[in-house]
């Protein structure tokens, strides 16, 4: 059944009218009678023992420490992994005798206003005894390094090994290229910071936590574990949320504290994260280090990849994903869509005196793509071929689909080489090569870069179990209910914070039932009203929850068809559901009439009517436990000023395949936003720490993010290869735009700097880094000349 506003239609977002008119309801908009504000005393040191906490007499009763929470039976946050050898770190919601990163909460202060709470926090004196600091993950893994957790034998959460012995290939391969590659630590900087309002609902005897989160049910589970109470005594509500990107996809200490205070004080409390807290005290992301070697033949055909990878996971393991998700992903996804036979990868999740690392948009894929795509260009340079040609040499061809790569990742569908060919054509490579050869009048250097990535989404239970996640997803549920006036109410456990679910899920339901979009209402983000879900993350929502919506609506459609046929005195096999009506020949009865019969005139129903009525709860799991793979090739042309180190993006093309697009306009929006964040990763964003573990970027004067003038016009070209395993053939696309830009831009910058003999392998590619690399190369050349003389 095809509809003008169903699957595949460019429908304007239903959410926009409310949000653009300022009618959204965020945590900051909530005002409860008697609500108190919270401020946290945070550690100014990266590693220290707490030898004393002095609270002014006049503020006793307004300041709470871990001793208060522990006395009430509150337990630390405990994020474990199912992978053998994982070391568990327990994170108390307020520091217990020791702090392990700058910004770790030590005490919480309660007052009528945030300003008063901050004044109280400033009056609390904490006595610290400094301890040695681990601020560099490569130093932290060395023998004798000071331990972040005293009872551990070292500073490694987990070491993993994937693949086998490739010594023979290493010894015989005609081409061997090696690189040291590093990605910077980042913050996630959503438009809205984290916020929490907690109160005790005396009527139902529940803690109600309204929080800007991506996963209400998982936060409820974590609170239950920490507070030692049944999940039925906790309700978690996610109101409108101003972006998440992973930062709002975990249980945070402040949520535990707020929930406990609300019950203990029997008063509503609120904590609102300010920007300085986010930059200096919040979870970080992305910091990877690779030692990687590619082996190839004379044409650039990959024979094998060998890599060691380190991920700086910070001081604690985050709930629910654990500290090892990112590194565990690296080992299994590094080969990507490339078809080669020999592989070995060893990874280390390293514990340091920094905030914990959190899965950020793209998770490990951004770092993996940055490393792997540099190696493809390095191989191309070694064999004297165009980088796009070497990609074609190595990408899995469409005739091999479905395809299992060297780490047994099961690729469901796609034509990866075609995405490269279309990107080459769209960027007009020959024209750029001619311009590059002729040179620019202003002396800038032209470079063209490519990057191809794949994005696995809607993974099943086996995949997540293999990564050690204790909270194993694999299915999703949705409720669909025909209202008495013939409308439709959908309830899903995933939470929408920019994914356009109010629109796209309505399109899915409309495709099945034909009910107009304006009569479809979505309820989400509330554990008290929706079915269980592991939340919105990993580009899973449309495949999983959208599949559940479709499944529930199909069951409803069958019930509607049977009742409608009975009302027209026809057999069910003679009836069809079209455009919101059940039809038998030329006769028709509307869904509104059927709903009226069910709710108001049940005496007219058939005797064997399904007693479930016009309300369905359905579960959904894709046809393959491996999920789906969307993919894209990004192509970019840049101009690099070798005197200033400045990079200008001249053209940017994305050729992507998201399978069947429920709403192409929404897909475009996700790609635009992802590319903007990827440009930030590539050129601007870095959270530096000094040797003492002090964060060196506490404002947006120091932590740079791209604005409108830094983000170019992005040209998007859609391919369409439906997944054989999902409803309508959809694939996940939410994170993909952020994965490839760092790799594509790095390759373009290196292409521009090639005449100077300069190669950049670390992100971000800032002017300072580019100028330093040029100066280093010039110094080496001068030293070589002096040596020759």
Where on the chain are the PLM-derived regions?
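Short Pro/Gly-enriched beta-strand edge/turn motifs at strand-loop
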Residues: 78-81, 172-186, 271-278, 322-323, ...
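Short glycine-rich loop/turn motifs
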Residues: 96, 192-197, 289, 447, ...
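Extended active-site and interfacial segments that coordinate phosphate-rich ligands
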Residues: 17-18, 125-129, 214-216, 221, ...
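Flexible, low-hydrophobicity surface segments
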Residues: 1-153, 264
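Glycine-rich loop/linker segments at domain edges
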Residues: 9, 15-17, 80-89, 154-196, ...
């Amino acid at each position: 059944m095809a509809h003008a506003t169903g699957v595949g239609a460019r429908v304007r977002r239903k959410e926009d009218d409310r949000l653009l008119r300022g009618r959204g309801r965020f945590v900051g908009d909530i005002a409860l009678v008697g609500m108190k504000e919270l401020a946290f005393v945070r550690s100014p040191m990266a590693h220290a023992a707490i030898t004393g906490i002095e609270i002014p007499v006049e503020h006793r009763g307004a300041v709470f420490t871990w001793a208060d929470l522990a006395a009430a039976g509150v337990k630390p946050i405990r994020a474990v992994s199912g992978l053998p050898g994982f070391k568990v770190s327990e994170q108390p919601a307020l520091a217990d005798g020791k702090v392990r990163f700058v910004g770790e909460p030590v005490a919480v202060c309660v007052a009528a206003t945030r300003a008063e709470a901050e004044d109280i926090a400033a009056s609390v004196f904490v006595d610290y005894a400094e301890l040695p600091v681990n601020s560099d993950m490569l130093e932290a893994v060395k023998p004798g390094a000071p331990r972040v957790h005293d009872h551990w034998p070292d500073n490694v959460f987990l070491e993993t090994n994937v693949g086998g012995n490739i010594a023979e290939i290493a010894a015989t391969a005609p081409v061997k290229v090696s690189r040291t590659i590093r990605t910077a630590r980042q913050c996630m900087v959503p438009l809205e910071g984290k916020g929490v309002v907690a109160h005790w609902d005396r009527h139902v005897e529940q803690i109600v936590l309204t929080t800007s989160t991506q996963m209400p049910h998982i936060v409820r589970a974590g609170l239950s574990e920490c507070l030692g109470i049944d999940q039925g005594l906790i309700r978690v509500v996610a109101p409108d949320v101003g972006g998440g990107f992973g930062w709002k996809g975990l249980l945070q200490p402040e949520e535990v504290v707020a929930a406990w205070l609300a019950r203990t004080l029997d008063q509503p409390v609120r904590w609102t994260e300010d920007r300085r807290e986010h930059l200096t005290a919040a979870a970080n992301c992305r910091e990877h280090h690779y030692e990687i070697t590619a082996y190839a033949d004379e044409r650039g055909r990959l024979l094998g990849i060998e890599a060691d990878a380190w991920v700086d996971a910070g001081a604690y393991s985050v709930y629910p994903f654990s500290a090892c998700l990112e590194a565990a992903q690296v080992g299994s996804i590094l080969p990507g869509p490339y078809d080669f036979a020999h592989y070995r990868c060893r990874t280390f999740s390293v514990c340091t005196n920094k905030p914990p690392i959190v899965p950020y948009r793209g998770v490990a894929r951004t770092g993996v793509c940055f490393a792997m795509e540099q190696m493809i260009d390095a191989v191309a340079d070694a064999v004297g071929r165009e980088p796009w040609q070497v990609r074609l040499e190595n990408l899995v061809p469409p005739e091999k689909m479905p395809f299992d790569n060297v780490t047994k990742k099961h690729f469901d569908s796609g034509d990866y080489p075609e995405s490269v060919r279309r990107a080459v054509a769209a960027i007009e490579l020959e024209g750029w090569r001619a311009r590059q050869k002729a040179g620019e009048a202003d002396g800038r250097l032209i470079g063209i870069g490519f990057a191809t990535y794949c994005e696995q989404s809607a993974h099943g239970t086996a995949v997540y179990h293999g990564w050690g996640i204790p909270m194993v997803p694999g299915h999703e549920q949705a409720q669909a209910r025909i209202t008495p006036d013939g409308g439709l109410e959908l309830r899903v456990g995933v939470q929408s914070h920019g994914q356009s679910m109010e629109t796209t899920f309505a399109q899915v339901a409309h495709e099945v039932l034909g009910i107009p979009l304006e009569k479809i209402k979505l309820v989400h983000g509330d554990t008290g009203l929706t079915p269980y879900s592991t939340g919105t993350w990993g580009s899973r929502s449309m495949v999983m929850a959208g599949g559940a919506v479709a499944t529930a609506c199909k069951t409803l459609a069958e019930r509607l068809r049977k009742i409608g046929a009975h009302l027209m005195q026809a057999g069910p096999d003679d009836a069809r559901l079209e455009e919101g009506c059940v039809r038998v020949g030329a006769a028709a009865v509307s869904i509104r009439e059927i709903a009226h019969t069910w709710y108001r005139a049940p005496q007219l129903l058939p005797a064997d009517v399904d007693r479930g009525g016009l309300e369905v709860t359905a579960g959904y799991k894709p046809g393959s436990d491996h999920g789906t793979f969307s993919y894209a090739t990004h192509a970019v042309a840049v101009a690099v000023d070798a005197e200033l180190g400045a990079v200008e993006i001249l053209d940017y093309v994305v050729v992507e395949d998201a399978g069947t697009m429920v709403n192409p306009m929404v897909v475009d929006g996700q790609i635009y936003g992802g590319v903007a964040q990827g440009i930030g990763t590539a050129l601007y964003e870095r959270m530096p720490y000094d040797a003492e573990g002090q964060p060196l970027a506490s404002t947006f004067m120091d932590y740079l993010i791209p604005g409108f003038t830094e983000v170019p016009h992005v040209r998007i070209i859609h391919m369409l290869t439906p997944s054989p395993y999902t409803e309508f053939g959809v694939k996940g696309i939410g994170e993909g735009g952020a994965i490839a830009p760092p790799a594509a831009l790095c390759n373009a910058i290196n292409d521009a700097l090639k005449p100077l003999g300069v190669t950049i392998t670390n992100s971000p590619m800032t002017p300072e880094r580019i100028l330093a690399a040029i100066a280093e190369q010039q110094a080496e050349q001068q030293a070589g000349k002096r040596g020759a003389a």
